[in-house]
């Protein structure tokens, strides 16, 4: 059968092949036609880098399929992968390698199946289809390898419309990862998602285990209104603080924002609006607090009542 190989210069090469040809054979044919040594060739099909030992039929490459040929930079670069046991593995990679390729290299060295590997860089879990250069991973960068527990666990996410979404997660998944999974399923951008568990809004950088979220726990998904609103908080010293909030923010969330701005621990804050002391578990909309409302902040004396 015939297949096509497209180079980065836009040139298309036609090859005569068999479904049982290995990728290695195909690279040899490209060398015959174009003079490019196989060790400088990387072949991509359907977004995947093809491995030398596999056959065309393994990748479901059929007649008149088009492969993409990327030239491997001589020498590539080294990166390090640190495991939880403290062992450091050195890998030879290219900036254009996908995370999937990196996991395959780790499997070659360490025997760990890719589906049990989670790679972390700069606090972010790396996605299989992305490349090292997408994440700005450069020579001698260190990735962290976390083993994925077989099977993980299921959690539920309930929306305000009453719909319940089931997600496959790991205890070590970050809230950011969970929001990405919700985006995959429901198409809701992470920056419009707020996740609540046990009355608390969950922070992107924390993990499910940080919040003691276990299998079959239910999270609540609240959509963040674009833009939110501003409110003011006036202290006894007369100072006024401006906060960006959502009507669905809890009083607890507001106290956390005040702590971020002013350094006052939430347990020392009492918030008053319309003569009422506000309770942690309630939301701003529960108290009809609207944009540009002013709350009063009274400090709770330590040990007081």
Swiss-Prot record:
ADP-ribosylglycine: residues carrying this PTM: 76
Covalent link (Glycyl lysine isopeptide (Lys-Gly) (interchain with G-Cter in ubiquitin)) residue numbers: 48, 82, 87, 103, 105, 124, 139
GO annotations of cellular component type: cytoplasm; mitochondrial outer membrane; mitochondrion; neuron projection; neuronal cell body; nucleus
Site (Essential for function): 68
Cross-link (Glycyl lysine isopeptide (Gly-Lys) (interchain with K-? in acceptor proteins)): 76
Domain of life, source organism: Eukaryota
Residue numbers marked as site, Interacts with activating enzyme: 54, 72
Record-level GO BP terms: adipose tissue development; energy homeostasis; fat pad development; female gonad development; female meiosis I; hypothalamus gonadotrophin-releasing hormone neuron development; male gonad development; male meiosis I
Annotated propeptide span(s): 305
Result of altering residue 64 to Q: Rate of phosphorylation by an insect Pink1 is increased
GO molecular function terms attached to this record: protein tag activity; ubiquitin protein ligase binding
Membership in a protein family: Belongs to the ubiquitin family.
UniProt miscellaneous comment: Ubiquitin is encoded by 4 different genes. Uba52 and Rps27a genes code for a single copy of ubiquitin fused to the ribosomal proteins eL40 and eS31, respectively. UBB and UBC genes code for a polyubiquitin precursor with exact head to tail repeats, the number of repeats differ between species and strains.
Subunit and interaction comment: Interacts with SKP1-KMD2A and SKP1-KMD2B complexes.
Protein name stated in the entry: Polyubiquitin-B
Organism: Rattus norvegicus (Rat)
Lineage of source species: Eukaryota, Metazoa, Chordata, Craniata, Vertebrata
